[in-house]
C-alpha cells in the first residue's frame, strides 16, 4: 500500500536540519512511502544537497514561505500564517495529495490549524492527543494529553472509542481494554464528570475495565487510559520529570567514588539494556485523533531517530485504517448507546 506523508520541515527546535534527513532516511527504508517536504525551498534544498539527494517520484518539495514560531499564539498563527509550512502540509491532506502530516512545530497552533483545515469526524466533538507510554508488560495508549483541559463525560467516552480503535487498528489487537483515570477504583470516587463517563462506558459495549489510578498506567493494567487533557498532561510531565531525576541520581551514584565508577563499568551492559528499553524516543509521535486525516505531533526537540519514529507512527495509522475504523466505530457505538443507555444514576 503506497502512502504519501507531508512533512512540516520548518517546525520544531531544529527545523530542516532534523526533519529533512529523517524523512529521507525513512523513505529509503520503506519503499511504499512517498514524502512531500513542505517549507522554504531554498532551505530544504540545502539539506538535500548535503545528503546528495535529489527530488524525484517518491520525494518532492512543496513550497511554503512562512514558519509558525514555537511560542506563537495559536490564534495568531491560524489567522496570519496561511502560507506556513504547517498549514500547507495540512492542506495537502485536505486536497488528497497526502494521507498524513507530521509536524514538530507549535502544539497549540497544530491543534487549532488541524481542526480548522481538516474538521472533526462526524460524532467527534473534539480531537484528542494520544501517546504511547512504556509499561511493565509492554506499553499503553493515553489520551487526552493536553488538547482539551475541560471535558464532558461524552468527550471522555469519545476519547475511549478513538483510543481503542487506534490500538485495534495499529496493533491488530481485538477488543482492547479501557481504563478511566481516577483518584480511586471505587465507583463513588471522582468528580461528576468522571462518574458520568464511567456510566457511559459501561453502557457502550466497549471493553471497559473500570476506574484506574495513576500507578496503573505503568503497570499496563489496560491497553488504553482515558482522562481529560489537564490530568493527562500533568501525568505525562510528572513522569518525564521523574525519569530525569532517576537518571540524574544514577549518574551521581556511579561518579561518587572510584569503586562506584568501577561498578558502573561492570554494570554498563545492564544499564545500556535498560536505557534502550525506556528510551522515550521510540515512543515519539502523539496522534491527534478525531480529525478527517492522520496528524502526528512530534516532540519539538526530537532528534533524527525520534522523528523517524513519528513518521512510522503516521504510516502505521494510515495502513491500519485508523481513520476509517474510528468513523465506523463511532457510528456503531452511538447506535448502541442510544438503544441501551439508562438514565443517570445518582450516587450518594
UniProtKB/Swiss-Prot annotation:
Q: In which pathway does it act?
A: Lipid metabolism; phospholipid metabolism
* Cysteine-cysteine disulfides: none
Q: Which InterPro entries match?
A: FA_synthesis, Phospholipid_synth_PlsX-like
One example of a Gene Ontology biological process annotation? fatty acid biosynthetic process
Q: Any idea where this protein resides?
A: Cytoplasm
One Pfam family assigned to this protein is: FA_synthesis
EC id:
2.3.1.274
Q: Which UniProt keywords apply?
A: Cytoplasm, Lipid biosynthesis, Lipid metabolism, Phospholipid biosynthesis, Phospholipid metabolism, Transferase
Q: Name one GO molecular function term.
A: phosphate:acyl-[acyl carrier protein] acyltransferase activity
Has the keyword Transmembrane been applied to this entry? no
Q: Which reaction(s) does its UniProt entry say it catalyses?
A: a fatty acyl-[ACP] + phosphate = an acyl phosphate + holo-[ACP]
**GO cellular component term, pick one:** cytoplasm
State if Zinc-finger is listed as a keyword.
no
- Name the enzyme's class: transferase
Query: Looking at the record's lineage, which domain of life comes first?
Result: Bacteria
Q: Which family does it belong to?
A: Belongs to the PlsX family.
Q: Which NCBIfam families match?
A: plsX
Q: How does it assemble?
A: Homodimer. Probably interacts with PlsY.
Primary role: Catalyzes the reversible formation of acyl-phosphate (acyl-PO(4)) from acyl-[acyl-carrier-protein] (acyl-ACP). This enzyme utilizes acyl-ACP as fatty acyl donor, but not acyl-CoA.
Per its record, how is this protein called by name? Answer: Phosphate acyltransferase
Q: What species is given as this protein's source?
A: Nitrosomonas europaea (strain ATCC 19718 / CIP 103999 / KCTC 2705 / NBRC 14298)
